[in-house]
Every structure is written in C-alpha cells, then in structure tokens.
Amino acid sequence: MSDFLGQTFEGLVVGAIYALVALGYTLVYGVLRLINFAHSEIFMIGTFACLGVTMILGYSTDMNPLGFGLFIVIFTVIVVIAGAISGASAMLLERVAYRRLRRKNASRLSSLISAIGASLFLIEVFRLMTESTDWAFPRLLESKVLFQISTAYIDQTKLFILISAIIMMVVLDQLIQKTRLGRGIRAVSQDERTAVLMGVNVDKVIAMTFLIGGSLAGAASAFYLLAYESTKFNVGFLLGVAAFTSAVLGGIGNIRGALAGAFALGLIQQYASSVLGYNWRDVVSFVILVLVLLIKPTGIFGESLQRARV
C-alpha cells in the first residue's frame, strides 16, 4: 500500500510537468488545427534559459541548497525569465514558420512539415551550441521529507512542483474562461471566419496563444530542472512525446482534457515502471499514443468534450 501511495505521488508530479507542456500542444491545435511538433524544443529552450539565469546569479552545482524563503524569490525569477524567453521563442516560431503558410491557405501537410523542420533546426542548433553534453542544474531546494506514510515519502521539492503547477493550471483555465483574450481564443477555436466578422484580431489571438503555450513550457522546464537537475539539447523529445500523448489521451484541443490526460499518463507510467522497470517508462508513452490513435482518436472523453475545444 505504501509503495502504491509513493508511486501515485510521483505520478502526479510527473503528470503536472506533462500537463504544462501538453497545454501548449492543445492550445495551438485548438486555434490552428496544427500539431506544433517544435513545441518540445520550446521546452528545451526554457531549460537552457533556466541554466543561464542561475549562471548569471552565480549559482553552481557545488553550492548548498537555498533556504525556502530565498528559494521562492530566486525560483520565481527563474520561472518568469524562462517563461518570457520560451514564450517569445514560441511567438517567433509562429511568425517565421506558420503565419505565412496560414495566410496563403497552405495545406495542413505543409504546416506539419514546417513544424518538423523547425523542430529539427532547433535541435541541431542547440546540439552545436552545447556540444551534445549534459548540463547540470544546481540543487536550489533541499529534498527534505515533509511527512511519511509507511515507507512512502513526500518531499518538499516535489510537493512544491505539484502545487505550483496546479495553481498555474487553474489560472490558465480562468484566463481562458473569463477574460477577453480567452473569449477570443475560444472564438477562433470554434469558428475563425465568424470570429473575424465579430471583430476578433485573429493574428493577435494566435500570437498570444503561442505566447501562453510557450510560457507554460518555460515554467515546466523550471519545474523539470528542479526535479531532475540536468538538461541537454534533445531533452524535449521524449518529454514532448509524453506531453503530446497526454493531449491526445484527454482529447487534443481541450484544455481540461489535456490536464486529465497528463495526470493519467503520469500515473500509468509510474505504475508501469514500478512493475517493468524505469527504462520502460517512455515506451509506455508510445504504446498509449498508438492505442489511443487506433482505438479512440478523439480521446478518452469522447466527442462531446472534444467539440468544446478550448
């Protein structure tokens, strides 16, 4: 029972990171009907932005963890800067790789090829810049056990990640449901032509959608480094597959579906790896993705929720 509780907690933490990245996939698909395969590289850019901030602030891997109060201040700075850089990168990606194709009414295949090309370009650029090496991230917060249930341990670092990520999800949900920008995103998602007739600036809405999705990926990159403490040029690939699987599992194009899919995948991965071994965790993502696409491509929530989109 204690092992089950421990695996559940770990699965929820992993799922929270997946969820923040999956939101970028589902938001873009909602407004453009485009699978932005370069989104995983926006996450990767975020990890290196986090590293850059810690280097500028003078933190290194041989330093002791920070006190919780100072950690909150420093980590907030890291998240804000990483989110800004990732968000700006996502907006630039939309401007360079997708906007001209959209204005020319190019086929979805053209946009898909552009997305794959952008992804490969970013991977190769960072491979050359970082010399294909792993980059360590300093331990900013001590992994102190807050409480224990039998042999299951709940440490403050992962609990902080889970709570912070959930807060971001709630804020995003409220932004989409209750703000003018959110109404614009939902309008474009449901019917772009009608949205134009109603006075919605579609280009601005799409750009802001990429900004939001990219910023969430940047925040996710900070949480990822807090948990795993290293990155490299291709760090976004497997995590991107898991996040995309989460979006498909819940019903791509639907925010709450993506969140549910992410937590479900995190739990499934954790339970499966406890039985099969950790190395099988990513295999589980591929298997689930294939099964969902074959059996229920609209996601586990079905057509009714899928029509709701964002």
Predicted regions and their residues:
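Helix-loop-helix "hairpin" substructures at the membrane interface of multi-pass membrane proteins
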Residues: A152-T231, I255-A260
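Extracellular/periplasmic helix-loop junction at the C-terminal end of a transmembrane helix
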Residues: L120-I149, S274-D282, F301-R307
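Cytosolic-side transmembrane-helix boundaries in multi-pass membrane proteins
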Residues: R193-L197, N201-K204, L276-V310
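Alpha-helical transmembrane segments within multi-pass membrane transporters and channels
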Residues: D62-S114, A118, A260-L265, K296
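Inter-helical junctions in multi-pass inner-membrane proteins, predominant
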Residues: S2-E10, V14-I17, L175-Q177, I206-S246, ...
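Pore- or pathway-lining transmembrane helices of multi-pass membrane proteins that form conduits
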Residues: E41-I45, R99-F126, V235-V248, A264, ...
